[in-house]
Curated annotation (Swiss-Prot):
Protein purpose: Catalyzes the reversible oxidation of malate to oxaloacetate.
Biological processes per GO annotation: malate metabolic process; tricarboxylic acid cycle
Gene coding for it: mdh
Subunit structure comment from the entry: Homodimer.
Name listed for the protein in its UniProt record: Malate dehydrogenase
Amino acid sequence: MKVAVLGAAGGIGQALALLLKNQLPSGSELSLYDIAPVTPGVAVDLSHIPTAVKIKGFSGEDATPALEGADVVLISAGVARKPGMDRSDLFNVNAGIVKNLVQQIAKTCPKACVGIITNPVNTTVAIAAEVLKKAGVYDKNKLFGVTTLDIIRSNTFVAELKGKLPTEVEVPVIGGHSGVTILPLLSQIPGVSFTEQEAAELTKRIQNAGTEVVEAKAGGGSATLSMGQAAARFGLSLVRALQGEKGVVECAYVEGDGQYARFFSQPLLLGKNGVEERKSIGTLSTFEQHSLDAMLDTLKKDIQLGEDFINK
């Protein structure tokens, strides 16, 4: 199993690479790519960790050597948020970066499962899909927007509020990956209930958690370590499913049946070919249903922005 991390010299990329070096199954290969010249050195640094995961780093304009034979590609390349920016302010820079890298994936490892971490995810996933489609290699079961950070934040905040162990809580999060499009299904957590006010306040905190980190870092960056953890969890789940493990379920932002929007985050059963089944989002509370209805315009506009970036 070969996993490639694109954007591996950045804050998310380094955290992700460290976790993968420690947690990928023995015999796996990990390849790191970034435009920054430090990348081969990051790989050398990580290569001293005593796990049976082969690691190699590549830098420069050409990601091809890193992508050859990859089963899973995780893209975290791009610029980070600064205070006062929202995820859509990143669009102008990051759209071009994602387009370029996905074009290289289409040429070099078109059958790989691709997880997009680069924000704004609502839009960058649509860009990736259109690039792959133009190249004639798009498989909607193999392209994912990584929204796992919303899930792990939800698990943490719910556990804090309700005095539970974070490992015992699993909150499904649907919709998209920014602002109002993030919708934690708090009504679906077994054995936990919320007042309407609690649900509204907690939902808002989960939606704004990224901004909480950006402001706390006072201009020094955005959520890199928790995002690295989230991306590693998703990447490792994907690897386990590709290797034939049954019953692996994760939420991610994928192209579905278009009931809500062309791309939508929902629980997925993962398998040997990527998405095996898009699972139902279940019964929503009145608050959740209202939030879902209210977000769809925003989500559809975000998606349209990505489609237009490639097709206009």
